[in-house]
Swiss-Prot record:
Residues 25-66 are annotated as: Disordered. One of its GO terms (molecular function) is structural constituent of ribosome. This is Large ribosomal subunit protein uL15m. InterPro entries: Ribosomal_uL15 (IPR030878), Ribosomal_uL15/eL18 (IPR021131), Ribosomal_uL15/eL18_sf (IPR036227), Ribosomal_uL15_bac-type (IPR005749). Gene3D superfamilies: 3.100.10.10. Belongs to the universal ribosomal protein uL15 family. NCBIfam families: rplO_bact. It is found in: Mitochondrion. SUPFAM superfamilies: Ribosomal proteins L15p and L18e. GO terms for biological process: translation.
Length: 296
C-alpha cells in the first residue's frame, strides 16, 4: 500500500527507512553535554587558569565548607535545641471529630446499637490507621460537640475532656485503651488475620510513660477502677452543667456496659481463640498451659 502524500506520508516513509532504536545507536541530543574546561597544568597554565591573582585561592586548595577564616563558625556559635528530638519514636493518633462520628452514624456506616472500636471506625472509612507509620490509634476531638446526639459505647486511644462530656451527656460511655502495634494491626485488619488461621494474640500492656494516663479515671482509662470512673463521670457532669443519665435503666444497658478485658483485642473474642473463616467456626484452646499464658 502506497504511503499517502504530504508531511504524514514523508514521516511514515522516514520511519520505515530508519534503523530500530537500540543501545548501540542511542546518543545524547546535540548540545546536551558540555565538555568541562580543562585548567592549565604546570607551565602550560594559560595565564591565570581561572584562579585569579596571587594568594591562597591561586596556590592552594579552597577552604573547607563552613570555614569562616578562623573565627568560631556559625554552626558552633548557635546552640542546639532538641525541637525534633525523638521524632521518629513519637506516637501518632489520627483525629476523629464528633462531627465526623455523627456523620458516619447518620449514613448507617456505624451501628450505634453495637460497641464501637477501631474495627468499626476503619471499616466505615472514618479513619485510616497505619501502624508502620507510628500510628497508635484514634484521638477523639471535640469538634461538633454541640451537634453530637448519638448514644454510643465507644473505645478510642485518646480523648479530650469536652469530647468525653459530649458522649456521656447523651447517655453513652467512652473508654480509652492502649494497643501495641501488632494488636493494632490485627484490630484494623481482622479478616486477613483470620484467614491466616493464627490464634488471636493477647494485647500488651501500655509502656511506662502511658500507665498514668490509662489508669486515670478522668481519662476513662481502661485500667482505671470502675468505682473511680463512676465518680469522675459525676464530677464531669457537674463541671459542664448537665444531668448524667442513668444508664442502668436504659434498654441498651447490656451493650453500654460492655467492656474489653485489658488483654482482649476484639469484642466477644478472647486471646488464644482461632477463627476458622471457611468453616465459620471458633476454635478454643483447652491446654492448661495455653489458658494460663493467654489469661496472664
Amino acid at each position: 500500500m502506497a504511503a499517502s502524500g504530504g508531511s504524514g506520508g514523508k514521516a511514515t516513509e522516514l520511519l520505515r527507512c530508519l534503523p530500530r532504536v537500540t543501545l548501540a545507536n542511542l546518543r545524547p541530543n546535540p548540545g546536551a553535554r558540555h565538555r568541562e574546561k580543562r585548567r592549565g597544568r604546570g607551565i602550560h597554565g594559560g595565564r591565570k587558569s581561572g584562579r585569579g591573582h596571587k594568594g591562597e585561592t591561586q596556590r592552594g586548595n579552597q577552604p573547607r565548607l563552613g570555614f569562616e577564616g578562623g573565627q568560631t563558625p556559625f554552626y558552633l556559635v548557635i546552640p542546639k535545641y532538641g525541637y525534633n528530638e525523638g521524632h521518629s519514636f513519637r506516637r501518632q493518633y489520627q483525629p476523629l471529630s464528633l462531627n465526623r462520628l455523627q456523620y458516619l452514624i447518620d449514613l448507617g456506616r456505624i451501628d450505634p446499637t453495637q460497641p464501637i472500636d477501631l474495627t468499626q471506625l476503619v471499616n466505615a472509612r472514618g479513619v485510616t490507621i497505619q501502624p508502620l507509620k507510628r500510628d497508635y490509634g484514634v484521638q477523639l476531638v471535640e469538634e461538633g460537640a454541640d451537634l453530637f446526639a448519638a448514644k454510643v459505647n465507644i473505645e478510642v486511644q485518646w480523648a479530650s475532656q469536652l469530647a468525653i462530656a459530649a458522649i456521656e451527656k447523651n447517655g453513652g460511655l467512652i473508654t480509652t485503651g492502649f494497643y501495641d502495634p501488632r494488636s493494632l494491626d490485627v484490630l484494623c485488619k481482622p479478616v486477613p488475620f483470620f484467614m491466616r488461621g493464627q490464634p488471636i494474640p493477647k494485647r500488651m500492656l501500655p509502656p511506662e510513660d502511658l500507665v498514668k494516663y490509662y489508669t486515670d479515671a478522668e481519662n476513662r482509662g481502661y485500667l482505671a477502677d470502675p468505682r473511680n470512673v463512676l465518680e469522675a463521670r459525676k464530677q464531669l457532669a457537674r463541671k459542664y452543667g448537665y444531668v448524667l443519665p442513668d444508664i442502668t435503666k436504659d434498654e441498651l444497658y447490656q451493650m453500654l456496659s460492655t467492656r474489653k478485658d485489658p488483654r482482649q483485642i476484639f469484642f466477644g473474642l478472647a486471646p488464644g481463640w482461632i477463627v476458622n473463616m471457611p468453616e465459620k467456626k471458633i476454635l478454643k484452646p483447652t491446654d492448661e498451659r495455653l489458658l494460663s499464658y493467654y489469661s496472664s
